[in-house]
Every structure is written in structure tokens, then in C-alpha cells.
């Protein structure tokens, strides 16, 4: 009898520094579920990995006097050493600097562009460097700071490519409200109320203000931003490759 597949992933961790108790918490939680499902007879795929591009990595590497790749290589060693020490039973560790991941992301970006789902525009907004996130004025906290880390944000404007997220607003709302796709249900309601009902905005998917990223093949001034870079890691779309 063929085993039923079960896929589980940790967050794809950002290696701007060494792992801490928060990384351990989520990884142990996933490991526990993966082990339980294996005991039940499922064919488990347990993924973890690191999201290794972006401005913060570029800045950290410059502070240390090394290249971004040299910097993340050392931090990743610490992550893997910790998971080995804790006997974490992951099946794959995917790094966004892996050659096969880079090739896959470039193919995805080009395919979306060719199909008209990605277009070039200009982004204006409040930017938080530690979180590598843009925010609208209404999303800032009561002090006008980043709603995630509560640090100061800067005014930013740059040429960028955008994914037509707004075209999928109705489909996403239906998925969140009429299915159990996202649990707990309170999170689904939160997404609908905070992002879809006010008017779902298109998603910035490239950057020009830093170089440490996956180049856009048809426009080398741009690097692919986290929403397509890191999230493609989670999809396991390059499953045929080896780690």
C-alpha cells in the first residue's frame, strides 16, 4: 500500500546572526510533528533551510569585512551544528544561495513576467531595514515605526517589479473564508480584514537598492525580492535536486 505523503516545513530562517531559542522552538515543534506522522506511516518530507539574501545580510557582511556568501556560510554552519546536536530529523535543508534554487527562482520570475503577472513600476513607502519590509502609513505602529519590530522606518522610493496580487483578491478571500486552508480561523479573518477588504495591493517582488540577491535575468539592475526568492524555497518545487 502506497504511503500517504505529509509535508511540513519550519520557517526559512534568516541568517543575519546565529540561531536563538525562537529558532529552536519552531524547529522542535516541526520535528515532533514529523516524527509523529512517520510513526503513523506517512511518507514525511520535513524541510528546513535559510533565506540568505537581502540588504541586512549585505550590511552585516560589510561590517565583518567578508563577502555576503562567506558570511552566510559561517552562520549556516552554526544552524546545522545546532540541528545536529538537537537530533532534528529534517529531510532537506535548502539554502537560497544553492545553485538549483537560484535557477528555479529565475525561471519562476521569468514565467510570471511572460504571462503578464509581473510588471515594472515604482514603489513608494516606509521601509524597515531590519525586517526588509515596506509598510504603508496606515500599517505603522502608534509611534510611526515598523509594526513588526517597532524600529524606525525610512522613506523609500525605487523602481521595482510588482506581482499582480490584486488580481487574485477574490480567489484568496474565498480560500480564507470558505475553507480550512489557514488555521486557526482567527488568522484567516485577520488577513481578510487587514489586507483584502481595504483593497489588496500588488506585491513588490524586486529590489534595486542592494546587490546581494538573485539577479532578474532580463533586467540585471534588479534582484529578486524575498516573496519569490524565499517562498519558492518553501514550495519544494526543485524537489528532484539533492541537498
Predicted regions and their residues:
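A charged helix-plus-loop insertion that forms the helical arch/lid used to bind
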Residues: 60-73
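A broadly conserved sequence feature marking short terminus-proximal activation segments
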Residues: 71-127
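Short low-complexity, flexible loop/linker segments enriched in glycine and/or proline
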Residues: 59-63, 107-110, 134-138
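Cys/His-rich short segments
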Residues: 117-169
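Structured secondary-structure scaffolds
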Residues: 1-48, 95, 100-104, 155-240
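Short, charge-patterned binding micro-sites
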Residues: 50-56
Amino acid at each position: 500500500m502506497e504511503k500517504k505523503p505529509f509535508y511540513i516545513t519550519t520557517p526559512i530562517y534568516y541568517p543575519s546572526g546565529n540561531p536563538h531559542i525562537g529558532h529552536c522552538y519552531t524547529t522542535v515543534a516541526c520535528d515532533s510533528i514529523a516524527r509523529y506522522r512517520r510513526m503513523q506511516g506517512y511518507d514525511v518530507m520535513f524541510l528546513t533551510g535559510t533565506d540568505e539574501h537581502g540588504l541586512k545580510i549585505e550590511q552585516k557582511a560589510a561590517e565583518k569585512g567578508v563577502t555576503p556568501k562567506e558570511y552566510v556560510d559561517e552562520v549556516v554552519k552554526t544552524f546545522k551544528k545546532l540541528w545536529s546536536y538537537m537530533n532534528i530529523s529534517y529531510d532537506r535543508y535548502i539554502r537560497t544561495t544553492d545553485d538549483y534554487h537560484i535557477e528555479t527562482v529565475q525561471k519562476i520570475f521569468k514565467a510570471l513576467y511572460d504571462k503578464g503577472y509581473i510588471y515594472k513600476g515604482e514603489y513608494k513607502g516606509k521601509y524597515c531595514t531590519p525586517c526588509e519590509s515596506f509598510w504603508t502609513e496606515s500599517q505603522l505602529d502608534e509611534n510611526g515605526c515598523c509594526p513588526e519590530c517597532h524600529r524606525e522606518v525610512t522613506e523609500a522610493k525605487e523602481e521595482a517589479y510588482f506581482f499582480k496580487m490584486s488580481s487574485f483578491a477574490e480567489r484568496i478571500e474565498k480560500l480564507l473564508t470558505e475553507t480550512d486552508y489557514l488555521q486557526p480561523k482567527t488568522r484567516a479573518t485577520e488577513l481578510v480584514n487587514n489586507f483584502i477588504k481595504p483593497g489588496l495591493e500588488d506585491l513588490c517582488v524586486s529590489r534595486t537598492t542592494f546587490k546581494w540577491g538573485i539577479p532578474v535575468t532580463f533586467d540585471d539592475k534588479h534582484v529578486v525580492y524575498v516573496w519569490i526568492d524565499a517562498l519558492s524555497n518553501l514550495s519544494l518545487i526543485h524537489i528532484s535536486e539533492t541537498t
